[in-house]
Amino acid sequence: HVAIRLLHREIASDSDQLERFRREARAVAQLSHPHIVTVIDAGEDDGRPYIVFEYVAGETLKARIRRLGRLDVSESIAYAIEIARALGAAHERHIVHRDVKPQNVLVDEEGRAKVTDFGIARTLDQEGLTADGRVLGTTDYVAPEQALGHEVTGQSDLYSLGIVLFEMLTGDVPFRGENQVAVAMMHVRDDLPDLQARRPEVSASLAAVVDRLTAKDLGARYPDHLEVIADLEEVLMVETARSGGVTGEATAVLRTLPEGTRRRVPLRVRHPAWL
């Protein structure tokens, strides 16, 4: 089975939308990763561009959060690791997703997370694609610099990942406003609600990772996916030791960790200097 994304005729006649669609095909076709939905083919039929994806049976991460209310702490960490690994594969190819949200993460029947819909992905070495400063991302998860129309980088995806992790742990996004613009400005100006107040069993180490992911100052935010993954893996090990074991996707993620990492319990998580 496959999934086909077809551009509507009226959108296909819009040169900007058409370029965005073609860009998605080019960007995702470069990526091959177990946590990214694979592009099988792309082209145009009778003037209508299309992309053929692998079909992923399961549900979106958003649907999973809505169904369960919130996720287990260890499962939340595991999905964050898988998403970070997927984003890392994209960032290493100079591709920024720009719209990281749980609606764009599929959870397959085996419980694995797969990132999809690079519909507004942009290669870092392309120029002029956001010269008008438009905010293209979903504002519930939008990074402050993206909301302000500034340069968007891999760090912007990491901010969005932090918001997704917050939602997995609490069952809700951190900000609610009258409209999408109001929410975007809350990302620019307001501190996130206290994660541990919302969910007391979240450890200080995990809360510190979320804080650093969602730092508004780029200098305080994680610089790249490698540090994020390293810290999340260590937090998962600590959570495993504290709870006496994990289930579900956290078990699968633990099996992917280096043997040396699995032996180091408890593990120290690097805290940002400003905490």
Which ranges hold each PLM region?
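Conserved ATP-binding/catalytic core of the eukaryotic-like protein kinase fold
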Residues: 1-190
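Phosphate/oxyanion-binding loops and surfaces in catalytic or ligand/nucleic-acid-binding neighborhoods
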Residues: 59, 168, 190, 216, ...
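An acidic site on a long C-lobe helix of protein kinase domains
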Residues: 79, 157, 202, 221-224
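Short proline-rich PxxP-based motifs
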Residues: 187-200
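Conserved C-terminal C-lobe helix
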Residues: 201-214
